[in-house]
A protein has these predicted regions:
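Cleavable N-terminal signal peptides of Sec/SRP-targeted secreted and luminal proteins
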Residues: 4-24
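Protease zymogen maturation seam
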Residues: 27-41, 144-201, 213-215
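Inhibitory N-terminal propeptides of secreted protease zymogens
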Residues: 47-166
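Subtilisin-like serine protease catalytic core
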Residues: 52-59, 75-76, 153, 178, ...
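Extracellular S/T/G-rich loop segment that most often corresponds to the catalytic His/Ser-adjacent loop
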Residues: 206, 349-427, 431, 473-480
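Hydrolase catalytic cores
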Residues: 247, 265-270, 347, 391-464
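Short acidic, glycine-rich surface-loop motifs adjacent to enzyme active sites
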Residues: 286-316, 336-337
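Secreted peptidase-domain scaffold signal
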Residues: 338, 465-468, 473-486
Length: 486
């Protein structure tokens, strides 16, 4: 654990503050990129300057990462069996995980909490990541925090961009005809068998949801199905529209959703952008949902899938504790690959570039990859995206009124198609873990696809998996059949 003399720290700050203005201008130039990070992970003395940069030019909020992390706790308490579980077994496992993570955070954060409380500093603990967020931390307190052996590092609150969609067309039609995406992946064939996702709950972390929309009003789970950390609103709402569109693509009625019989829940982490602290709060909510005031968490209400149409940077290991906790709880994480395809190879963003999350690229009606869709390999060398799915001109619900619709393009629209497909699979055969679900999905794709505009890495786009199409375009009928046969 690095320790610093405060005088040396101030000297370093004074020396390096000369570059702060230039760095801020550079950050502005990068601001339009998907997943742009307005700050850099902070470690050692040079990183403390990044904290000063943030306090001068950003949100004044830092995140203190504890040295012990969460992985040893999860390894010790979570049931790592890959067997198919009953729902009761899944809920008991989640309860064990939540109890252990809470106790671990309480013990490891004790000295830090005492220090912050004595200084009269506002803070909030996140047990899912074993971190503490602090608002307006004075510089003189930073050295004391870093001197604690229980503290690993300080990072500052990141601004995370939503996966920005491309508007295609507006529509107020209330047609019940299935969208082209659901038809393309043969979700409609699954519906014909009577499976529309019954018994499965899907969560999203996004801009909220217009819960009264005609496509979504009937299948919200109700209590413990909504959390707005900033405003503590009592019922779902969405001032942006992005979250309504993505949710309806997963579970919406009137032809919008892949799994219209599934239930939904949501946590509002974003406006036009999201913050890392809000993502942490919502990730924790998904593991143990609370009432609308953030109290009385109930692991029995945890969703089976969390769909995320946002991302930031590349190789961001900070998200790993969140993914580890969800995986241990058999909550399957789905992420959009990103809309930075114009940058070429290795443009897939985090957290979808993790081995423990599904990353989804976007295709059009002819199965061609959208020009905007990010491709691999990931910066950690993994083949990404994992799968591709419809994501061009996807018609879904919008937030203008209860019968408002819009067609959008983006990997934000593709990830919900995979989330809905997984919901259909879990409805047919509940209880799969992430690794088993990946095995089922990867063996069930359609691979007669157009040649990609470019190939990345060492393999051709005709060999699967590859860094353009992953394992191929999802096929819900094949996935459900494979789940039933597993």
């Amino acid at each position: 654990m690095a320790r610093f003399k405060f005088a040396s720290f101030l000297l370093a700050v004074a020396t390096l503050l000369l570059v702060v203005s230039a760095e801020a201008q550079l950050g502005g130039l990068l601001g339009n990129l998907l997943g742009t990070v307005t700050g850099v992970v902070a470690t050692t003395v040079s990183s403390l300057v990044k904290i000063v940069d943030n306090l001068l030019f950003d949100s004044h909020r830092i995140i203190i990462v504890m040295d012990k992390g969460t992985k040893p706790v999860l390894d010790a308490v979570a049931n790592s069996s890959t067997a198919v579980w009953t729902e009761a077994e899944r809920i008991q496992n989640i309860k064990n995980i939540v109890d252990a993570l809470k106790l671990h955070a309480q013990e490891s954060q004790g000295p830090l909490v005492q220090l912050l409380s004595a200084a009269g500093i506002q803070f909030k603990s996140h047990w899912i990541t074993n971190t503490v967020e602090v608002l307006d931390c004075p510089l003189e307190l930073i050295e004391k925090i870093l001197a604690l052996l229980s503290v690993k590092e300080i990072i500052y609150d990141l601004i995370i961009t939503l996966d920005p969609p491309e508007p295609t067309a507006d529509s107020t039609s209330n047609t019940v005809t299935a969208g082209w995406g659901a038809t393309k992946i043969k979700a409609t064939n699954v519906w014909a068998s009577g499976n529309t996702g019954q018994g499965v709950v899907v969560g999203t972390i996004d801009t909220g949801v217009r819960g009264t929309h005609e496509t979504l009003a009937s299948n919200w789970i109700g209590p413990y199905g909504w959390y707005d950390p900033a405003q503590k609103t009592a019922t779902p709402y969405d001032p942006n529209g992005h979250g309504t569109h993505t949710m309806a693509t997963i579970v919406g009625g009137k032809g919008t959703g892949v799994a219209p019989g599934a239930k939904w829940m949501a946590c509002k982490a974003c406006e036009t952008t999201c913050t890392l602290t809000m993502i942490n709060t919502c990730a924790q909510f998904m593991l143990c949902p609370t009432d609308t005031n953030g109290n009385n968490c109930n692991p029995a209400k945890a969703p089976h899938i969390v769909s995320n149409s946002w991302g930031t940077g590349q190789g961001m290991t900070y998200f790993q504790p969140m993914l580890d906790a969800w995986n241990a709880a058999r909550i399957i994480p789905v992420f959009s690959a990103g809309n930075s395809g114009s940058k070429g190879c290795s443009s897939v963003v985090s957290p979808g570039d993790s081995a423990k999350a599904f990353s989804v690229g976007a295709t059009d009606t002819s199965d061609a990859l959208g020009s905007f869709s990010s491709i691999g390999p990931a910066v950690n060398g993994l083949i990404k995206p994992d799968f591709i799915a419809p994501g061009v001109s996807i018609r879904s619900a919008w937030n203008g009124n209860n019968a408002d619709y819009v067609s959008l393009s983006g990997t934000s629209m593709a990830a919900p198609h995979l989330a809905g497909t997984i919901a259909l699979a879990l409805s047919a055969r509940p209880g799969f873990c992430f690794d088993t679900m990946k095995e089922i999905l990867s063996g069930s794709t359609d691979r007669s696809l157009p040649r990609a505009a470019q190939t990345c890495g060492t393999m051709s786009d005709t060999v699967f998996p590859n860094n353009e199409y992953g394992y191929g375009r999802i096929n819900a009928q094949n996935v459900v059949n494979a789940a039933l046969a597993y």
